[in-house]
Amino acid sequence: MAERRIPFTLQRTPSWDVPDLHQTSRIFDQAFGLPPVFEDFSGFPTTHWPGYMRPSLMTPDIMIPQSPMMYHPGHMMAHQARALSRQMSSGMSEIKQTQDNWKISLDVPHFSPEELVVKTKDGVLEISGKHEERKDEHGFVSRSFTRKYTLPPTANIEKVTSSLSPEGVLTVEAPINKPALEYSETTIPVNVESSGAVAKK
């Protein structure tokens, strides 16, 4: 099957889909190229995170051994809640499928339409993004990613569309081909014609 690229359409206003009871799946923790938030981990002793942080990035207060008794349960829960909130609010993709439509929504806030490529090949949807090194509040950063999704066998590849919202959410949709109707068996009676009238056999 030949490779096919999907053009973008930009959404000028955000749209919200009505929730349904069909299949839905989400993929978390896809924050492409985001730096770690040290406040999420500063409340934990360094012995709990062996080799996680680079020595050059550790601040003196993090390097000081601390006793687990110093950590109040409420304080620990607050740090965990912030870490979970950050994880769930960035880089999330969602797949939804109904009887008529298949849709993937991917959070790509750091990429412009020119830096994104959406294409299909051999029943696989591939979304990739890349931008060269640029400066942000943490220094210089370059980002790239590639995500592949297996399309349903009944998806209409020729009618796949994609759109990018102002909030940086990329949505790709593919209509689902309806199966051929199955007709029940019907026996047709045979009429026998006679010279005077038509008799039913």
Curated annotation (Swiss-Prot):
Biological processes per GO annotation: chaperone-mediated protein folding; negative regulation of apoptotic process; protein refolding; response to heat
Superkingdom in the source lineage: Eukaryota
Subcellular location per the Swiss-Prot or TrEMBL entry: Cytoplasm; Nucleus; Cytoplasm, Cytoskeleton, Spindle
Classification via InterPro entries: A-crystallin/Hsp20_dom, ACD_HspB1, Alpha-crystallin/sHSP_animal, HSP20-like_chaperone
Domain sHSP: 83-193
Its biological purpose: Small heat shock protein which functions as a molecular chaperone probably maintaining denatured proteins in a folding-competent state. Plays a role in stress resistance and actin organization.
Protein name from the UniProt record: Heat shock protein beta-1
GO CC aspect terms: cytoplasm; nucleus; spindle
Example GO molecular function: identical protein binding
Subunit (UniProt): Homooligomer. Homodimer; becomes monomeric upon activation. Heterooligomer.
Location of Phosphoserine modifications: S15
Predominant cellular place of this UniProt entry's protein: cytoplasm
Annotated keywords: Chaperone, Cytoplasm, Cytoskeleton, Nucleus, Phosphoprotein, Stress response
Family: Belongs to the small heat shock protein (HSP20) family.
